[in-house]
Amino acid sequence: MPWQLDRRRFLRSAMGPLLPLPFLNLMERKASGAAADGPPIRFMTLFKPNGVHPPSWSINGGTEFDFRMSPLMQPFAKHKQDLLILDNMGDFGFSSHANSTRRFLSGHHRNTKSASVDQLIADRIGKGTSYRSLELTTEGLFPNQIGCSYISYDSNGDPIPRESDPQLIFDRIFRSPMRNPSKRREMKSVLDRVSEDAKSLSRTAGAEDRQTLDQYLSVVRSTEKRLESIAAASNDIPKATMERPLAPANLNEQVESMLDLISLALWTDSTRCVTYMLGNSNSRMIFDFLGVKEQHHYLSHFFRNFSRQNLDALLKISLWHMEKFDYLLTRMKSYRDHEGSLLDHSVVLYGSGMGHSDNHTATRIPIILAGQGGGLLKTGRYVRYAENQQLGRLHLALLKMFDADHDSFAYSTSPLPGLNDSDFTPYREQPFQSWVKTGDGTITVQGRLRLSDNLDEARIFLIDVQGQPPIRIDVAFRDFHDFNLAYHCGTPVKITGSVTEKNGQPVITKVQKLDSLFGKKPGSANG
């Protein structure tokens, strides 16, 4: 059947097609009763560098449908019903920055000869769009560990170049075929050049389409002006002051501009697959616009570099990352797309490559899925799996969600359950006895291990023992690392160590032995 308006319709200028359009009701089929094509499902990935401070990220207690958002999740608490928060993701004791970056979309750090999951999804959904996929970043290459700079890989396992300049992305989407930056000054606003066609289209459109078109043109105009302001501000900065790795004062503007462009590109069906790195996995950026004076990577090692000032600075950066995630979701929810919003017809993956940022623990990796995926995701849930899950299982589930024909991915042969139903095995702590036994200068404690949530003592671990105050663990970095205390947090353990007394309470100052009551020890599979 013919269409009233082709889905690939562009607003035209004297030079020809120029500006892609979002979905309009005019694009539905003419014949009454004819089935219209369903909305395309998009895939978007937002990568957060340098892991997290677990007590600020992790959800404590709660159930699948009844849970409280953690402190770091508060910026997007209003999106709770659009989120699927996954816990117990990742099954490695430790991980390097480079390996954790590779694993984020490739499932395993040894999966070096095949495409990352985003590219396999792009193969499935990207045909017929102007851009099969977009690979974007905030930070330049880190040459000392080049693998820290990439999450997207082609079919040969080679990294795909990223673009960091939102102005260039704007030109690709809205100023094609005039993509030469040197020509920008000679060009009118893209909206000025398509104004006559826009007026003509508006006259034939219904009320809802006119509202969508007005919103779209307004967003394009504001994005264009924002990019002009960024460019003007950049031209005013003396080159001698631009010393890497300082983040530019307008980084927030640049990132929000890129998120605007991502939303527009998805909304206009210019692409259906985007990856965006908020920084390299070992990001050295200094967020001076937040009042932070140290490198992000240095601050992420909050155990060995502990001070309350450093931890507060780290949490400022992590909170900023979450605010940008909130910004993206808010944008996507505001754009009408068929019978719903752009977010309703998208799957957005947010996360990092490692859990505990200091110890590089590759368990309890922060992973959130957002959007309904056209009904493919069941959101408003917190899913904590009974056992640690390989990221490859998540990727395989995503591939099947997008009808990509894969029986395995990155050493995983079964898809992760629980993404669109409650058919998964949730974490339930087995019953155990907690107790304390003391000897000559030693103590053995059995109980649940956790990190202190008091930010003034972020180096302190606690073992909860029924009927008495928790036993404190205050040890040097060597014990923290060698016994991988971060790996065991949230689970029952038995610890023997040297003990001293402080303020009338026992404090373990050196760990001699650690046994997990129910889980496996880390270290046999490091990556």
Predicted regions and their residues:
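Ligand-binding pockets and gating/stacking loops
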Residues: 1-434
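Structural detector for short beta-strands of small beta-barrel domains
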Residues: 440-457
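OB-fold and OB-like beta-barrel modules that bind single-stranded nucleic acids
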Residues: 445-449, 490-498
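OB-fold (S1/OB) nucleic-acid-binding surfaces
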Residues: 456-475
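Short nucleic-acid-contacting surface segments enriched for D/E, G, S/T with interspersed K/R
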Residues: 479-494
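OB-fold/S1-family single-stranded nucleic acid-binding modules
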Residues: 502-523
